[in-house]
Amino acid sequence: KWFGARSAEEVIGKTDFDFFSREHALAAFEDEQRIVETGQALPGYEEKETWPDGHETWVSTTKLPLRDPAGRIIGTFGLSRDISDRRRAEAQLAHYAEELRHRNEELEEDLEMARELQSALMPRHYPCFPPAATSAESALHFSHFFNPSKAVSGDFFDILPLSDTTAGIFICDVMGHGMRAALVAALVRALVEELKGIADAPGEFLAQLNAKLTSILKQAEMPIFASAAYVIADTAKNQLRYANAGHPAPLCIHHEANAARALPLDRCQRGPVLGMFSGAQYGASQRDLSIHDMVLLFTDGLFEVEGAGGELYDQHSLMRAVNGRVNLGAGDLCREVLTEIQQFSANKQFSDDVCLVAVEVERLAS
């Protein structure tokens, strides 16, 4: 049947040259001659045949020397097993693997573009206060660290020049990781830009941001949220004004007290995360601002770090680290705290998205 014969008699006395292509038959003949000459079997090799109608078949063949009772080689014999289905399945798998590789390459290219775009959205140059001042003369100095755990991140920050003497510092952390979180972070950034007109009122700013974000996410049926903190440093009024949306409380280093503490909320609770409750309200608090005071805003990836023994670097650990370095400038303090946490980590690096922003008061306008 394999050769298209109706009975065994039709194949008796015929050779490979009667059934296969000349190339195939010659190769088989040479193999058999070598077996006769050497006595060495030819186990499990694969043969391909293209038939006159164009279809292809594969067999796994084992050929051995045929010996007479005295042990002399008088010919060869063999067994062939049809493996055409297996080879077709392997070819199909190879095709799927190549297709998957191509799609992965496209995905990697898209992720790289997304990473570059997200990087471009982050502040590359810090604003000066007033704008005509050099970075050394600016009333406010900034420093930041941004480390996505994947190609892109749900962490985001922005620095908003509200006047010649006032800056708004916004930070948020979108639930989850990767592309999904990064897309929502980009949406939050666009909304922050849209709401700059009310950015001098922290509570109202977060309330409007939440209302718009919640509306969009509900339409998209995306169960996702973001925590955020917003701090205004006003060097004309010597004042910090701030509001919080379910975010870790920023730390303020008071130069006169030579100590850091979490920014407290005045007669109001921390507001809920953004994107969950459309009518949420956010109370604003304020504190006096002195020269050389510093405020640190950060996402929870900075302190939710596990050590080699399973112990956790928590907010209390972070507070101790900052209090041990209150005499350093913003840049040096950030670098040393980050180094301490990375050295504490079991794998010496951050496993979550991390964003840290510091603002230091160099001079007051009043």
Q: Would you name each region that the model predicts?
A:
Residues W2, E9-E23, A190-K196, V273, ...:
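PAS-family sensory/regulatory domains
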Residues D68-R72, L79-H95, G176:
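PAS-associated C-terminal cap
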Residues Y96-L296, K348-S366:
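… and, occasionally, acidic/histidine-rich disordered N-termini of signaling adaptors
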Residues T61-L64, R72-D82, F170-C172, F298:
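PAS-family sensory domains
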Residues F17, R67, S84, M175, ...:
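Adenine-nucleotide cofactor-binding loop residues
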Residues K1-T76, H141-A151, F157, P161, ...:
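PAS/LOV-family and closely related PAS-like sensory domains
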Residues A229, S285-L297, L302-S366:
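C-terminal catalytic subdomain
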